Regions:
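Short, low-complexity disordered leader/linker segments with a strong preference
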Residues: 1-34, 326-327
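N-terminal (or domain-start) structured segment
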Residues: 25-118, 156-158, 164, 180-207, ...
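Extracytoplasmic/secreted proteins, especially bacterial periplasmic and envelope-associated proteins
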Residues: 51, 55, 59, 80, ...
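Hinge/capping helix and adjacent helix->loop/strand transition within the periplasmic-binding protein
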Residues: 87-93, 107-193, 242, 247, ...
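A ligand-binding cleft/hinge motif common to bilobed small-molecule-binding domains
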Residues: 101-110, 169, 176-178, 205-237
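Short, charged, surface-exposed secondary-structure boundary motifs
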Residues: 194-197, 234-238
């Protein structure tokens, strides 16, 4: 066989193999899902991320005609569930729904995965603020009064977080930096435990996700005094933004969906479309608007954009607050 003939045959075989690979990928996307999909929530039940997941999972179940099963894998501030997803086979049957803690963890932990390059982004779901929520025994009725109290009693006010390095931790440390206060961090293994101690009065406050604390604020069991987003939230317009008292302070919590790196583009596209359509359903819009969530509507890249933004932001918070990285 001549060199030219060998080249033609080899080139043909390469093209054939490539086309076969593309056809197989397309076929998988068209027949997907053929069995239940596991949606990992890297936190204990009851928190904002869990509530968002349980709102969207039934809609995805209807759209795909296969169960989308919530798998709560709490621990490590969300890193355990995230690593489990990163290590999963990229076939679309293991996905992960995360919050801002996914980015804040990268600012404080030495992670066994890269939160940007080791994943396949699917969709940004929405953004909102956290609510400074006080136990009723705390006398402060405003952000200004809380700052005055914290300055008069440095390190005496205890604030809860859902874990070291999580968004409830670093958003509060950003407040300490901007307001010139010192409040003591008490980390918990999830929202449920933190809220239990807050309601019991063992902890004085939390910068809590709206899905978790808003019902308690409305019931009078907690007192919300300030929202972390740059502007007031339409769900609670009577509560001022912290920035009205502390100029330049702003922090949001977002929710997003992703899968393991190598997830076929067709599966990513189907999930992105399903999430965006689900977010426009009247009952979903009403539920999430009631939780104060501003719904997103964009391509997978929108998720990566907010991750990159917040990894950089909270690395600076960790540095400025002199928080020791966790190895």
């Amino acid at each position: 066989m001549s060199r030219s003939t060998l080249y033609v045959v080899t080139h043909f075989l390469c093209i054939t193999a490539s086309c076969a690979g593309l056809a197989a990928t397309q076929s998988r996307a068209e027949t997907y899902p053929a069995r239940p999909v596991r949606l990992i929530v890297p936190f204990a039940p009851g928190g904002g991320t869990d509530i968002i997941a349980r709102t969207l999972a039934p809609k995805a179940t209807d759209a795909f005609a296969q169960p989308v099963v919530i798998d709560n894998r709490g621990g490590g501030g969300g890193t355990i569930g995230a690593e489990l997803t990163v290590r999963a086979t990229p076939d679309g049957y293991t996905l992960c729904l995360v919050s801002t803690s996914y980015a804040t963890n990268a600012a404080i932990f030495k992670l066994p995965y890269n939160p940007i390059t080791d994943i396949a982004p699917i969709a940004l779901i929405g953004e909102t603020g956290l609510l400074i929520s006080l136990h009723p025994s705390v006398a402060a009725r405003s952000v200004k009064e809380l700052i005055a109290m914290a300055k008069a009693r440095p390190d005496e006010l205890n604030y809860a977080s859902t874990g070291t390095g999580g968004n409830t931790h670093l958003v509060t440390e950003l407040f300490n930096l901007k307001a010139g206060t010192r409040m003591t961090h008490v980390p918990y293994k999830g929202t449920g435990a933190a809220m239990s101690d807050l309601l019991g009065g063992q902890i004085q406050l939390i910068f809590g996700s709206l899905p978790s604390v808003l019902p308690l604020h409305r019931a009078g069991r907690l007192r919300g005094i300030g929202i972390t987003s740059a502007k007031r939230n339409d769900a609670i317009p009577d509560i001022p933004a912290i920035a009205e008292t502390v100029p330049g302070y702003a922090a949001t919590v977002w929710y997003g969906l992703w899968g393991p790196k190598g997830l076929p583009a067709g599966i990513v596209s189907r999930w992105n479309t399903t999430v965006r359509r689900s977010l426009q359903l009247p009952d979903v819009k009403e539920r999430l608007a009631g939780e104060g969530l501003a719904i997103a509507d964009g391509p997978p890249q929108a998720f990566i954009d907010v991750v990159q933004r917040d990894v950089a932001k909270y690395r600076e918070v960790v540095r400025a607050a002199k928080i020791d990285p966790v190895q």
